[in-house]
Amino acid sequence: MPSVITVTSDDLALPLEQHVAQVAAALDAHGHVVALAPAEADDAARRRLHTVRSALEADRLAIVPLGLPPLARVLLGEQLRQLTGTDLGPGVLAGAARLLSYYLHSGALLGSVSKLDRVPVGVGSHVKSLVPGRHFAVLAHPEPYIGEAEPAAVPPGPGYMTQLALAGKGLDPGWITGPLAAAWRSQHVREVPLPPDSARWWGTGKLVEFTAYIADVGMLYQLVTSVRRDTCTWCGLEVIGDQCLFCATRLGDRNAPAKHAADPRGRSVETPRRPQLEPHKR
């Protein structure tokens, strides 16, 4: 059963040798590890994980960069850990990280946007953030949105059933648990610990981060299995998408036999016209 981890700045508190030992133990116990990392190539925690991967010479560790806010990455890791209990293999799970990110709606309630650089901020919002008592509703994924947090002003949400998670400190979460949860028709609202990278990501320590996500493992499984699978021509893992996230092989020649694995069940697959990580365009 593969293991799924979420890369955070807390990983940097570990000595490199200890970090290497932890990942090695996870690989020994689970066979494969899927690590969800920040999208920024210069992120210190992500660079550390690449160092660990190189030290172990581990092609069973997939580092998946995602341009998601910290809470969304944590919840995506939770979703993938649910799916590890199904019959999905490690290559499919790694690709599912990108696929399922389409179904996350993530933002934050902020007391100031003066240092926010993840979402375009207009001059008017910068000026308003200087006024005490102003709260801003910001959506970073899937589409950027910024506005004052008012009962009648709610960013567009998911068009399907989700649960809502929130995490934060320093601000009243009433706008999230009230108008936002009602407008997004959230089935359940729960509070979780604030991820260690949230304050840096959002540019302020006074925030309440929120994410709408699909909690039903059956629905998650259906979404993942609705995408066509292929077999990596190098390592032989079954994957979704146009690249194996473990060995980084691009699946350009879909009909070539795997070099390091047995015949993938004799299936014949047609060459797709586009990558398969865009579920709404299949």
Sequence positions of predicted segments:
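Long, leucine/valine-rich, helix-dominated scaffolding and oligomerization segments
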Residues: 1-50, 54-58
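Residue-identity detector for glutamine
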Residues: 18, 22, 60, 79-82, ...
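Surface-exposed beta-strand edges and their flanking turn/coil or helix-capping segments
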Residues: 19-20, 48-50, 76-79, 247, ...
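Long, charged N-terminal interaction/targeting segments
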Residues: 48-215
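Cys/His-clustered metal-coordination modules, chiefly Zn-binding fingers
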Residues: 169-282
